[in-house]
Curated annotation (Swiss-Prot):
The keyword Metal-binding applies. This is Probable cytosolic Fe-S cluster assembly factor GF22738. Pfam families: Fe_hyd_lg_C, Fe_hyd_SSU. [4Fe-4S] cluster 1 binds at C23, C68, C71, C74. SUPFAM superfamilies: Fe-only hydrogenase (SSF53920). It comes from Drosophila ananassae (Fruit fly). GO terms for molecular function: 4 iron, 4 sulfur cluster binding; metal ion binding. Keywords: 4Fe-4S, Iron, Iron-sulfur, Metal-binding. GO terms for biological process: iron-sulfur cluster assembly. The keyword Zinc does not apply.
Length: 476
């Protein structure tokens, strides 16, 4: 069974394969002219050998994860590669080797290891081990330090920056064309589906603001690296996320720096993988020695380290952007209430700003592939313009119910588990992205707000993938 979101499991024909079985990616072959025929035989050790006038071992065909992401065929075929490149086994191997390097004298090969932990995994693990979310963060920090982490961070600052960038991007697009529907961009399952299925039709509607994971990558590799006087290649950055799709996002070529020869995020592990790591050594999270999370961003350390954002469970994009736009565009700072348009569909919420019977702003939150598909089809039929902004997440109930959150216990329904996690989320203090710290970060590192540097580092681009259906994809 695939671990990725529903949006990543849909393709034209029979997509659930792995590269080792039948990859449909067309690979160019450099042909050499031959005066005589040749035979290709398979040797005992599995390699192919061409024999004509002589014998020659043929080059092994390799298909990378980047090939999979750039291919219009199967998406889940990348899963086999991710298992080895983005797994807890690979993480533990890297940490073990790094510990040995640090023990050597005059060593310049070891790396500084940084973990960045999102809020949703903390909630999932807190519920599993029946401890508070703050306690979970401290025990997790202690556990990661025991494995070899040098820094353990929350993603709060990246969450804040993502909201600030997204709201200003919406304002710019609205002023250019107030009929344009803008979609959020933090869900990699949704972005990958849009690139591969709808291409250039839908991509101009997607916000270019990077997800918090990738903003965190910039902050760790460049800002923190500068403070530590370390090149990006000497930092190993691990994120803890609620869904497997984040592994795909971290592997995008857009988030690899040729200058620094480094990815913004080197490895992604998930809530359920953390649980598995503990189970494999017969341990529990509360048994780990607690430690404080690190705060390297500015001098004023927050009293608490784990925060929620607005009233939704996936970053709060729709509500935050709505409040900001209502105030900036229409001088309206009234509190809003989420109006559920379809009571039986809790994954589709709509809310609006109305004045004198005229709807000035209409926003929506759409979770789950069914709602995504319906919205895209409405947009194609010219009916999607009634929404100015849509917060989209591929998983039903959003990131709190990510595909890699800790599984329900025996006999527990997924819906019940999700409700418990939502209750924990709503009890968290709410972050205020407009604060002295984020302003200082913009001034010190991004050369100010709205600068070329901030745009280059906090925004990304998307790529339409042309559909190629070669003969190898046909099942007879």
């Amino acid at each position: 069974m695939s671990r990725f979101s529903g949006a990543l499991q849909l393709t034209d024909i029979d997509d659930f394969i792995t590269p080792a079985q039948e990859c449909i990616k067309p690979i160019p072959i450099n042909k050499k002219n031959s005066k005589s025929g040749a035979k290709i035989s398979v040797q005992e050790d599995g390699y192919y050998e061409e024999s004509g006038t002589g014998k020659q071992k043929l080059q092994k065909l390799e298909i990378t994860l980047q090939d999979c992401l750039a291919c219009s065929g199967c998406i889940t075929s990348a899963e086999g590669v991710l298992i080895t490149q983005q797994s807890q086994e690979e993480l533990l191997k890297v940490l073990h080797e790094n510990k040995k390097l640090k023990a050597e004298e005059d060593n310049n090969l070891s790396r500084t290891v940084v973990f960045s932990v999102a809020t949703q995994p903390l909630i999932s693990l807190a519920y599993r081990y029946k401890i508070s979310v703050e306690e979970t963060a401290r025990h997790l920090a202690g556990y990661f330090r025991s494995l070899g982490a040098d820094y353990v961070l929350s993603t709060k600052v990246a969450d804040d920056l993502a909201l600030l960038e997204c709201r200003n991007e919406f304002l710019e697009k609205y002023r250019e064309n107030n009929d344009l529907t803008m979609f959020s961009s933090s869900c990699p399952g949704w972005v990958c589906y849009a690139e591969k299925t709808h291409g250039n039709f839908i991509l101009p509607h997607i916000a270019t603001t990077r997800s918090p994971q990738q903003i965190m990558g910039v902050l760790v590799k460049q800002y923190l690296g500068k403070k530590l006087n370390l090149p990006a290649s000497r930092i190993y950055h691990v994120t803890v996320m609620p869904c497997y799709d984040k592994k795909l996002e971290a592997s995008r070529e857009d988030f690899f720096s040729e200058v620094n020869a480094s990815r913004d995020v080197d490895c992604v592990i998930t809530s359920v993988e953390v649980e598995q790591m503990l189970l494999e050594v017969d341990q529990t999270l509360p048994a780990q020695e607690p430690a404080d999370l690190d705060w390297p961003w500015w001098d004023e350390r927050p009293e608490l380290m784990v925060y929620s954002h607005e009233s939704t469970y996936s970053g709060g994009y729709a509500e935050h952007v709505f409040r900001f736009a209502a105030r900036e565009l229409f001088n309206d700072a009234r509190p809003i209430q989420l109006q559920i348009d379809q009571p039986r569909n809790r994954d589709l919420k709509e809310f609006f700003l109305e004045k004198d019977g005229i709807v000035l702003l209409r926003f929506a939150i759409a979770n789950g592939f069914k709602n995504i598909q319906n919205l895209v089809q409405k947009l194609k039929r010219g009916k999607g313009s009634k929404f100015h902004f849509v917060e989209i997440m591929a998983c039903p109930s959003g990131c709190i119910n990510g595909g890699a959150q800790v599984r329900p216990i025996s006999g527990q329904h997924v819906r019940e588990l999700t409700q418990k996690l939502e209750e924990l989320y709503t009890k968290l203090p709410r972050s205020q992205p407009d604060n002295i710290g984020t302003k200082k970060l913009y001034d010190d590192f991004f050369d100010g707000f709205g600068t070329d540097k901030s745009h280059n580092l906090l925004h990304t681009s998307y790529h339409s993938v042309d559909k190629l259906i070669p003969a190898l994809n046909i099942k007879w």
